[in-house]
Amino acid sequence: MATAAGATYFQRGSLFWFTVITLSFGYYTWVVFWPQSIPYQNLGPLGPFTQYLVDHHHTLLCNGYWLAWLIHVGESLYAIVLCKHKGITSGRAQLLWFLQTFFFGIASLTILIAYKRKRQKQT
């Protein structure tokens, strides 16, 4: 049986990775939905590369965008299953894991995967 602390276990992920993921997904969203508003010439080497992708592979970018969100949904659902398997029974903790994994994907899920619940010794 899980301890009370284990049943409510939640750990926020790394601010570094959350920032990287947020900026990357934000840029990806901008590229997919508003490519005409991107100042390609001001982005250094990223500008011409992004413009090439938009001009020649926009359908692939769109499909990849929705696939990335679909993967995040799958990771989030797996996080719920993993919570139950690891003895995290608190609805609030499970919701936090679901949301964090939905928005930040593998950066969150790896924390949950690494979690080892402490087993109580039977006397």
From Swiss-Prot:
GO cellular component: membrane
Cellular localization per UniProt: Membrane
UniProt modified residues of type N-acetylalanine: 2
Domain of life from the UniProt record: Eukaryota
Residue stretches spanning the membrane: 15-35, 61-81, 95-115
Signal sequence, start to end: none
Keywords: Acetylation, Membrane, Transmembrane, Transmembrane helix
Membrane topology listed for this record: Multi-pass membrane protein
Positions of disulphide bridges: none
Pfam families registered for this protein in UniProt: TMEM254
Name assigned to this protein: Transmembrane protein 254
Species: Homo sapiens
Name of encoding gene: TMEM254
